């Protein structure tokens, strides 16, 4: 599909429009698989083209990598071709398959489609797309507010002085991962032993990712249950991860994933996540007198001010983030309800 569209555009400057039926006539083996999988592949390509011409920063559509191919496909629910019943899933052309279902489906949910993929560890996962009628959530009376300051060591420190105490799953598994990778390096590339060991390495990475995701879900749920407004900094994580000393910690913490979880959880309950400007001097500003300490160095973990304020650097920043978030959102809280 992509090769023909690319060739047509280079020769004529026009976009080639063809249907999956053309490819089935040319390649009869395509009839052996789910017909909707081919339709969705074409739709995804069309979306990629539209995104590129709308905004070139998306990049021109590319072929899948032979080295690291994405083994997945998407299909749609039509006339009951996808069914979920008694721990089994029915897929077009695949029949009934036993699955491990991780959550219950709402009774009013309508099944729209499914995406099946094989991860690097050799396990298959399916994501089911459901349509649900969501009732509009009324904006709650905001009574509790908190500021979160990103911390390399802790994940975050809040304006009440709580340190998250992130377990650092990747660093804790580094020795085990290094041992598995050394064993992989001793295998002949492409051999059965190499492929088997490759899956073992991938499973360690998958386990770490699942541990991190589970922790971030639980931590974001705790914050959502207790606070009505959460204030954070709009950090440039891409630049931070490129730093020599910060890269591993930034990737291990999963701050971006954590803030995404926070945002959708808060919105579902009519609460609010406020992002303040990344250039706001939260760390350099004294939370007591408001004076800015321009010569504050990264190595200084305790904030000392001439007014007598002495406190943890991240706690001081979190208090300032909370206050700035309330200011830009135009929300006024009673003094007893502020996180200070």
Model feature map: region roles:
Residues 1-340:
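Nucleic-acid substrate recognition interfaces
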């Amino acid at each position: 599909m992509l090769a023909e569209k690319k060739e047509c555009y280079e020769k004529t400057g026009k976009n080639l429009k063809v249907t999956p039926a053309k490819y089935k006539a040319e390649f009869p083996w395509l009839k052996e698989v789910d017909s909707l999988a081919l339709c969705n592949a074409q739709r995804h390509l069309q979306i990629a083209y539209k995104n590129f011409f709308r905004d070139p920063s998306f990049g021109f559509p590319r072929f899948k990598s032979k080295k690291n191919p994405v083994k997945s496909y998407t299909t749609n629910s039509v006339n009951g071709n996808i069914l979920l019943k008694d721990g089994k899933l029915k897929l077009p052309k695949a029949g009934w398959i036993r699955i491990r279902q991780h959550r219950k489906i709402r009774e009013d949910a309508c099944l729209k489609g499914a995406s099946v993929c094989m991860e690097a560890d050799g396990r298959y996962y399916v994501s089911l797309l459901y349509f649900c009628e969501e009732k509009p959530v009324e904006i709650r009376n905001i009574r509790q507010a908190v500021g979160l300051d990103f911390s390399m060591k802790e994940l975050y420190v809040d304006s009440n002085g709580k340190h998250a105490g992130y377990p650092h799953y990747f660093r804790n598994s580094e020795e085990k991962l290094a041992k598995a990778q050394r064993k992989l390096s001793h295998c002949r590339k492409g051999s059965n032993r190499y492929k088997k060991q490759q899956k073992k390495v991938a499973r360690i990475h998958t386990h770490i990712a699942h541990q991190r995701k589970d922790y971030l879900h639980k931590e974001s749920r705790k914050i959502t249950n207790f606070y009505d407004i959460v204030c954070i900094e709009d950090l440039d994580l891409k630049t931070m991860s490129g730093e020599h000393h910060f890269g591993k910690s930034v990737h291990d913490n999963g701050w971006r994933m954590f803030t995404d979880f926070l945002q959708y959880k808060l919105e579902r309950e009519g609460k609010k996540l406020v992002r303040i400007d990344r250039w706001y001097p939260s760390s350099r500003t004294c939370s007591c007198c408001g004076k800015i300490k321009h010569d504050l160095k990264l190595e200084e973990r305790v904030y000392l001010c001439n007014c007598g304020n002495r406190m943890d650097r991240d706690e001081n920043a979190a208090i300032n983030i909370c206050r700035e978030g309330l200011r830009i959102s135009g929300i006024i809280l009673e003094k007893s309800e502020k996180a200070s």
